[in-house]
Structures are given as C-alpha cells and as structure tokens.
C-alpha cells in the first residue's frame, strides 16, 4: 500500500517538473515577442512563437464599457472579445454601460452573449471544484462527478431531466455564480441570467428537448469542455457574436449563434392592432433568420461528413 503512495508521489513530481520545464521553455521562446492587447504568445509544435487570442483572462472584477455598448468584466475580456470576433472594440469608459433613459429605434434586445454564457459557466465550475474533497486515510471524499450528481438529484423533479427553471434554481444556490451584472437595470440582469441558463442548456442538449439528462449536465459543466464559438448566418454571410442588423426601427443581435430581435411598433402608434401586427412581422422575420441559420449549419455538417 505504501509503495503505491510513493509511486503516485513520484509521478506527480515528474509531471510537475515537466510542467515547470514547459513554462520555462515558453518563457524563453516568448521573451521578446509582443502580441498586443487580447492576444498572448504561444509555442507551436515546431517550437516557434505565435500570437493567439487569450485563452482565459484572470477573473478580477473591474467592469468597463466597450465602444460596442457591451459591459465587460475587465479590460482583458474586452480585448479578448475583440480578438475572437475580429472586430475593433475600444474602452468607452470604466464601469458598467449606462442604461439609456428613453426607448429609441436603436434600442437593443436583452441577450446573453457567448462571453456572458462562458463567464457564468466558469463561475459555476469554480464553485463546484471548490467542493471537491480528496479521499482521506479513513474516509471517502467527493469527486467532481459525485458533486454534480448530488446537485442534479436535489433539483430534478423526478423525471431524470433538468429543465431551465430547475437549472436556474441550481445556479441560484451560489451568489457569486449568478452575480452577472451586464445591465444597469436589475430586471434586465435577472432576465440575462435566465437567458444564459438557456444558452448553457443548448450547449449539450443533444436531443434538443431543452432538458438535460445527467450525462448532458455532466458534459455541459465538464471543465475540459471548450464551448464552440457559434456564428449567425444571414443571406450567405456569417456574423460573429455581438453583430447587429436593423430592420425598420427594430434591431437584431447575434447572440450564442441565434438572432434575437426587438419587436417595436415603427410608426410610433400604441394601438393594439398596430402593436400586434409589428410583433407578428418581427416574429416572421426572426423565423426567417433562424431558417438561414439552420440551413447554414446543415450545409456545414454535410461538408464535414463529405470531408
């Protein structure tokens, strides 16, 4: 029994030394390489330096408002988003983006961007990992999978599936995890949490029933799983997360691979008939956008299979 522990310690020591050597090697190769904001130096398989978008920013909280009207957790997240989307985003001012007083034709819908979704997911994983208890000499601990199983059973209503309301109740167990404050208005932030929970469910909902089995739940919150960067499709063009387009006085935003639009009455009238007609027109338009998106994704899957 003792020799197994010594062997395990030896393997850990070897892995640690190897990791230290890799860090020193990377530091040496990247010593004189400047990558610019939102990018970091990495070493290729050939041992050459290259600049890539930052994989993960440090989670320190210093909100800034970007020139695109989005609030970011810190400067690093803003520049990382600019790098990933290939767009030019500058810091407009420190702090959360200010809420517009009046509703104007350019008002945007409340949406959960991929950066919001990934930040919520990161916080949940960090919270769950903090509950891991290693096995002791005379006691059994709790691993990551067992902790997830405990929460899954606690919030499942008995159908062996977590829907969005059950998932949201699970997330609300941790105050840090739900404290996403992109908007100045608290009601919008509450709506944002629900939208981001839906976005998390969509990540691993393999049968598209908007409910997660335990295996889907496990995949969604697997620390080694990297959520894909999804884009929106429209008229044979693809748009990055955060891209916007206008239809009359309404604005549509690309968020987590889906188009989300406002439903405003463009002639300024508040009559019920006009409002209903405007909403119906926007519903049809959003459906058209989603059809374009589904067609593009199907074409992509077919192309992948052919390759």
From Swiss-Prot:
Alphabetized InterPro entries for the sequence: EF-hand-dom_pair, EF-hand_FSTL1, EF_hand_dom, Fol_N, Follistatin/Osteonectin_EGF, Kazal_dom, Kazal_dom_sf, Prot_Inhib_GrowthFact_Antg
Highest rank taxon of the organism: Eukaryota
GO cellular component: extracellular region
Domain Kazal-like residues, every copy: 47-99
Compartment(s) of residence: Secreted
SMART domains tied to this protein: FOLN (SM00274), KAZAL (SM00280)
Residue ranges of domain Follistatin-like in the record: 29-52
PANTHER family: FOLLISTATIN-RELATED, FOLLISTATIN-RELATED PROTEIN 1
Assembly and interaction partners: Homodimer. Interacts with SCN10A. Interacts with DIP2A; DIP2A may act as a cell surface receptor for FSTL1. Interacts with BMP4. Interacts with CD14; this interaction promotes TL4-mediated signaling cascade.
Free-text function comment from the UniProt entry: Secreted glycoprotein that is involved in various physiological processes, such as angiogenesis, regulation of the immune response, cell proliferation and differentiation. Plays a role in the development of the central nervous system, skeletal system, lungs, and ureter. Promotes endothelial cell survival, migration and differentiation into network structures in an AKT-dependent manner. Also promotes survival of cardiac myocytes. Initiates various signaling cascades by activating different receptors on the cell surface such as DIP2A, TLR4 or BMP receptors.
Name of the protein: Follistatin-related protein 1
Organism: Bos taurus (Bovine)
Gene: FSTL1
């Amino acid at each position: 029994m003792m020799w197994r522990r010594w062997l395990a310690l030896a393997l850990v020591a070897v892995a640690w030394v190897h990791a230290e050597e890799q860090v020193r090697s990377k530091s040496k190769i990247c010593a004189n390489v400047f990558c610019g904001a939102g990018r970091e130096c990495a070493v290729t398989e050939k041992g050459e330096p290259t600049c890539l978008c930052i994989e993960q920013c440090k989670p320190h909280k210093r909100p800034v408002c970007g020139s695109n009207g989005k609030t970011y957790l810190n400067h690093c997240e803003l520049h990382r988003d600019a790098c990933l989307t290939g767009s030019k985003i500058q810091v407009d001012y420190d702090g959360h983006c200010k809420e517009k007083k009046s509703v104007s034709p350019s008002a945007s819908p409340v949406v959960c961007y991929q950066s919001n979704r990934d930040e919520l997911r990161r916080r949940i994983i960090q919270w769950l990992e903090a509950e891991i208890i290693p096995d002791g000499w005379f006691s059994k601990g709790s691993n990551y999978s067992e902790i997830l199983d405990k929460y899954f059973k606690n919030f499942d209503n008995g159908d062996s599936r977590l829907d969005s309301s059950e998932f949201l109740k699970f997330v609300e167990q941790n105050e840090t995890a739900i404290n996403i404050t992109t908007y100045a208005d608290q009601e919008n932030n509450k709506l944002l949490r629900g939208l981001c929970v839906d976005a998390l469910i969509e990540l691993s909902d393999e049968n598209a029933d908007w409910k997660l089995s335990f295996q889907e739940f496990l995949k969604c919150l697997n620390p080694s799983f990297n959520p894909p960067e999804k884009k929106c499709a429209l008229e044979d063009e693809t748009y990055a997360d955060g891209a916007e387009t206008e239809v009359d006085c309404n604005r549509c935003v690309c968020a987590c691979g889906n188009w989300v639009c406002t439903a405003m009455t463009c002639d300024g009238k508040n009559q019920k008939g006009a409002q209903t007609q405007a909403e119906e027109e926007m519903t049809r338009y959003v459906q058209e956008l989603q059809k374009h998106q589904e067609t593009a994704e199907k074409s992509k899957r077919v192309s992948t299979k052919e390759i």
